[in-house]
Amino acid sequence: MEKLNFLLKNTALLPTNLQKERLVQLVLLLNKWNKAYNLTSVRDPMEMLVKHILDSIVVSPYLQGNIFIDVGTGPGLPGLPLAIINPDKKFFLLDSLGKRISFIRNAVRELELTNVEPVLSRVEEFKPDHQFDGVLSRAFASLKDMTEWCQHLLTDQGFFYALKGQYNMEEVSALSAQFSVEKIIEMNVPELVGKRHLVLLKKIRINLMNYL
């Protein structure tokens, strides 16, 4: 907890004591499961706080809307940390590997989270009965693949939130003309070596009246 409090001082985030306890508990669960299921290459719990928890929750101030899907979530990143500090928002966490979804289900139960829905599926095959205000991805795919595979999940007003390391103009150039980059935000993740960026993208709405 001491380490987490120190890291949070270098952000604008103000989680409650219960939320901080749950973030620490999530790290302990991830560390425990990781020994058997190899969910992440990060082995040190202190490193997990920086590389997984802080790297996820710094996105929180930029989320617009109430219902989100985290595609290729792995062991629930960034979805689980974001759900912990945003109890008023709903998060669907999608992955195609059973062991990852098993971990997420266990974490949801242990942390008593009521705003998380684990989904075992490939993103292309997932056909929900509603769309989402935001599609999140962290180390999931290129911008081109993310937008094309996930476009059916997003409302017309929604955003794609792509967490990236070094910003790559080649990825932007490869985007289909039906998507636009709305904003690129350089993220400050305390004690994380290397640059982090949040890329916000939208679907371009075509006004059919222009063609009549």
Curated annotation (Swiss-Prot):
Function, as annotated: Specifically methylates the N7 position of guanine in position 527 of 16S rRNA.
Gene: rsmG
Any Gene Ontology CC annotation: cytosol
Residues binding S-adenosyl-L-methionine, per UniProt: G72, L77, V123, E124, R138
InterPro entries: rRNA_ssu_MeTfrase_G (IPR003682), SAM-dependent_MTases_sf (IPR029063)
SUPFAM superfamilies referenced in this protein's UniProt entry, alphabetically: S-adenosyl-L-methionine-dependent methyltransferases
Name of the protein this chain belongs to: Ribosomal RNA small subunit methyltransferase G
This enzyme's EC code(s): 2.1.1.170
Organism phylogeny: Bacteria, Pseudomonadati, Pseudomonadota, Gammaproteobacteria, Pasteurellales
Reaction(s) catalysed by this chain's protein: guanosine(527) in 16S rRNA + S-adenosyl-L-methionine = N(7)-methylguanosine(527) in 16S rRNA + S-adenosyl-L-homocysteine
UniProt GO molecular function: rRNA (guanine-N7-)-methyltransferase activity
Pfam families on file: GidB
Keywords: Cytoplasm, Methyltransferase, rRNA processing, S-adenosyl-L-methionine, Transferase
Subcellular location: Cytoplasm
Family: Belongs to the methyltransferase superfamily. RNA methyltransferase RsmG family.
Keyword Manganese on entry: no
